[in-house]
């Protein structure tokens, strides 16, 4: 498969866009970061012990389908887990990343997001960390969320302002 952008600036060809490195990611915001699918799967995320299957009224299934599981295929799970694939900055510098977390998030808790930050720091990669104080998981969901008790206007908009400031600084 070849990359075919759905948008190109009027004055530039695809070749010119590529030559100017305009397709490169310049900065990234990671929200509700799933950085370690291997560890998550080992901790029963793909079983009924994960409350999300109950809430979704769905049958548990593996992230990678029926054939693969984290016990028999740890390398595959680690291959899709960013925390195991961070290059040293001397080999390849990643774009700056904003890692976001919420104080009361029990699904992607602050400590989990900070673990990814530690891994980035060990590889000398640039990142910033921001914690949305006294907020639950899913603070960016639109409208109001009954289970988390979030309201997008109260909880999401302040988070988006932090994210936009990050992009303004790096783009």
Predicted region positions:
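Ligand-binding pocket scaffold of soluble enzyme catalytic domains
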Residues: 1, 56, 127
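Primarily recognizes the serine-hydrolase "nucleophile elbow" in alpha/beta-hydrolase
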Residues: 1-46
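Surface-exposed intrinsically disordered loops and tails
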Residues: 5-10, 23, 65-68, 144-153
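Active-site nucleophile elbow and catalytic-triad environment of alpha/beta-hydrolase enzymes
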Residues: 13-14, 69-89, 95
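Short, proline-enriched alpha-helix->beta-strand connector loops that line the catalytic pocket
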Residues: 21-26, 89-97, 123-126
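Cell-envelope and extracellular/periplasmic
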Residues: 33, 101-104
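Helical cap/lid subdomains and adjacent loops of hydrolase enzymes that gate the active-site channel
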Residues: 48-65
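C-terminal catalytic histidine-bearing segment of alpha/beta-hydrolase fold enzymes
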Residues: 96-100, 107, 111-171
